[in-house]
Amino acid sequence: MVNKRMQTLLTQLRQQGIRDERLLQAIEAVPRERFVDEALEHKAYENTALPIGSGQTISQPYMVARMTELLNLTPTSRVLEIGTGSGYQTAILAHLVQHVCSVERIKGLQWQAKRRLKQLDLHNVSTRHGDGWQGWASRGPFDAIIVTAAPPEIPPALMEQLDDGGILVLPVGEQAQTLKYIRRQGSEFVIDTVEAVRFVPLVKGELA
């Protein structure tokens, strides 16, 4: 049953324009039902965001795929994720690159994500309880940074932690949010707007 629901989801993602077969294989390899509350397992393969507690959500599969595809990852890409959340996006990244660094502001979510990733034998992830606005400078610079919550403006620390040629993908805004694609070229940053989105806010400073 799960396999049929997964195939339906993959078909939807292809119809929505997701073309990267390596990414689609990673999505197929990650059981989304393991990252949601038991009461919501029946919704795990619907193409929709779901609550995970603490006012946070597991992103819509299309948005996970879209943002990941924009990162243009190779197996050796150095990746930073801001907002571990349930660990679902983290797990997909872990199937695509040799190592993932992930920062989460809410301690309970960080521990739950670590447990889930371990249960799935994904040991190539380093998680940190910290302020996502500050990134993880000691592990940088990064080839790719993905942010799974929306700051009102682009955090300068994340731009600074991009390597030359690196890509930052994040939602930005408060009431009206847009997905931004930022590429570093030396000391310059090229910023493009991708599409309108809706994410929970990226809270600054305050750990929970």
Swiss-Prot record:
Domain of life: Bacteria
InterPro entries found in the cross-reference section: PCMT, SAM-dependent_MTases_sf
EC number: 2.1.1.77
Signal peptide boundaries: none
Catalytic residue positions: S59
Record's subcellular location: Cytoplasm
SUPFAM superfamilies linked: S-adenosyl-L-methionine-dependent methyltransferases (SSF53335)
GO MF term set: protein-L-isoaspartate (D-aspartate) O-methyltransferase activity
Gene Ontology CC entries for this record: cytoplasm
Location (main, coarse): cytoplasm
Record field: catalytic activity: [protein]-L-isoaspartate + S-adenosyl-L-methionine = [protein]-L-isoaspartate alpha-methyl ester + S-adenosyl-L-homocysteine
UniProt-listed Gene3D superfamilies: Vaccinia Virus protein VP39
Keywords: Cytoplasm, Methyltransferase, S-adenosyl-L-methionine, Transferase
Keyword Signal recorded: no
Record GO biological process: methylation; protein modification process; protein repair
Stated family: Belongs to the methyltransferase superfamily. L-isoaspartyl/D-aspartyl protein methyltransferase family.
Function description: Catalyzes the methyl esterification of L-isoaspartyl residues in peptides and proteins that result from spontaneous decomposition of normal L-aspartyl and L-asparaginyl residues. It plays a role in the repair and/or degradation of damaged proteins.
Alphabetized NCBIfam families for the sequence: pimt (TIGR00080), PRK00312.1 (NF001453)
Protein name (Swiss-Prot/TrEMBL): Protein-L-isoaspartate O-methyltransferase
Gene behind this protein: pcm
